[in-house]
Amino acid sequence: MKLTTHNTMSYQKPKQLWAKIIPFVARCQSVDYIKQYELGAVGFDLRLFWDKNGNLEFRHGIVSYPADNIWEVLDFIRDHDLYVRVLFELRSYNKKHVKNVETLKTKFKDFCKEIEDKYPTVKFYGGCATCDWEQLYVFKNDEHIPEIGLYSSNTSLFKSPNKILSVIDDLCPWIYAKLMNRKNMKKYKDSEQYISIDFIDIQ
């Protein structure tokens, strides 16, 4: 079993005031990226967007996190020979509220090229938009890692089509991690599979 972390940078304090009031919403990790590595992560998941002022930020859905440490994070990834999935975080439910989608897609593609040129040894993969999984950029080192996503929005706790239960499941990923992380890790313990999880500190 090889662990990667889902929404790696969501341990940070959100930028929006409303998200600071309810920080558990959309948070998928509670320890920083260095600790995630120390707990066994061999891959990270960086979801990118740009705010109204053109500043790069990490995102999970509509929740924004500061990305002023992006180069520090990428240096760490390079120095520890980690995989990193890079995604353009724009969901279908908020895409209609973003007027400059095509401009942002171009920014994402340009940024992917920039980091690939700056970090030629890093094993980047992804390059997609999360709203429809459109392939915006193809990384040269993309090894097409066959990750199994074992977190709430992929594998529901409730096993129900009920939309309210689905929202609870997606907004509170800690619940799934608390109930399922140990079971999932035990199941894949002797496997060579990559599994992507929330709250890697829950083992």
Where are these regions (language model features)?
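C-terminal intrinsically disordered extensions
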Residues: 113-145
